[in-house]
């Protein structure tokens, strides 16, 4: 490879490159660095991952309670202390040349390694309704922790039935005048303790067996059309904010050429985190697995780093 002066140089080579700087990625970096192996972590967003947005973590062993921001910060500092290198770039592709592996960043730079661990996590699943994308950031959000404060003393809705949706609803209820909690089923899938906590808020109204069918607004969110799936009744809710927390979906499109994906877009990997391609591993939420929790993300990061 020639440099700008016509000379020849080799791209920097690491033992391991990790794509994704969340819990799994940073755990893998910690374990790789502790083996005295060179390791770099590619992350275009926030090092620490989506858990940094969680106001409170209560289900990670050893911590009765810790904020997501503090948890992520501790992981990051530990990885750095052990010698992991952080590369604030988006990994755009993986290129295989014989036994050589390269991660290509969005700016076209190639970084060589012997082993790749994919730990990109997932992205919020949208409602897939007209106007949703256009009004994102204009009343629609996928992160109550990030954006909830903008809606203080206003009327909002939280959509979803898992723990993330319930946590969002609780945070919003502490800030907002009125919070509608919209869920398509009759019961919530989230932690029962959270459900009981929400019932104590006088400003929360539950709309169960209900779905949003239409989003209204030109330059900002104005209202949503909600349909009760049992009665068929439709109601228009005037809203200042809509917080969507209906789960996650994979973001593995760029890896489809070098790893096998399942029918839902998750990377096929066994319990050693090995993919269909030698030397490429997939850890945590981006891979096929039964459970996607903070603890299983850390476990996958460990396994992927230690697997030969």
Predicted region positions:
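A short, basic/flexible loop-to-alpha-helix module at the beginning of a structural domain
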Residues: 2-13, 141-150
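A Rossmann-like FAD-binding core segment of flavoenzymes
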Residues: 6, 79-105, 110-111, 173-271
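Glycine-rich, N-terminal phosphate-binding loop of Rossmann-like dinucleotide-binding domains
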Residues: 21, 120-121, 246-247
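Glycine/small-residue-rich loop that forms an oxyanion/phosphate-binding "nest" at active or ligand-binding sites
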Residues: 86-150, 161
């Amino acid at each position: 490879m020639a440099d700008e002066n016509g000379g020849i140089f080799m791209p920097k080579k690491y033992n391991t490159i990790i794509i994704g700087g969340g819990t799994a990625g940073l755990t893998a970096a910690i374990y790789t660095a502790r083996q005295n192996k060179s390791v770099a972590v590619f992350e275009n967003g926030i090092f620490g991952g989506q858990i940094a947005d969680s106001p409170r973590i209560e289900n990670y062993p050893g911590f009765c309670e810790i904020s997501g921001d503090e948890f992520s910060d501790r992981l990051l500092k530990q990885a750095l202390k052990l010698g992991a290198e952080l590369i604030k770039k988006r990994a755009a592709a993986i290129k295989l040349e014989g036994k050589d592996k390269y991660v290509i960043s969005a700016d076209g730079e190639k970084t060589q390694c012997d082993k790749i661990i994919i730990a990109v996590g997932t992205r919020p699943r949208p409602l897939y309704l007209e106007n949703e994308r256009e009004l994102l950031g204009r009343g629609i959000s996928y992160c109550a922790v990030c954006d909830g404060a903008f809606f203080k003393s206003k009327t909002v809705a939280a959509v979803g039935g898992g723990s993330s949706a319930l946590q969002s609803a609780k945070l919003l209820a502490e800030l907002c005048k009125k919070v509608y909690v919209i869920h398509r089923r009759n019961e919530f899938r989230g932690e029962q303790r959270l459900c009981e906590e929400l019932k104590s808020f006088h400003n929360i109204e539950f709309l169960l067996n209900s779905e949003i069918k239409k989003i209204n607004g030109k330059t900002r969110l104005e209202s949503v059309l909600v349909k009760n799936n049992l009665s068929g009744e439709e109601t228009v809710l005037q809203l200042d904010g809509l917080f969507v927390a209906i789960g996650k979906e994979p973001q593995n499109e760029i890896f489809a050429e070098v790893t096998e994906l399942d029918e839902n877009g998750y990377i096929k990997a066994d319990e050693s985190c090995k993919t269909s391609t030698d030397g490429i591993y997939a850890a945590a939420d981006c891979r096929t697995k039964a459970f996607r929790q903070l603890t299983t993300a850390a476990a996958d990061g460990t396994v992927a780093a230690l697997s030969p």
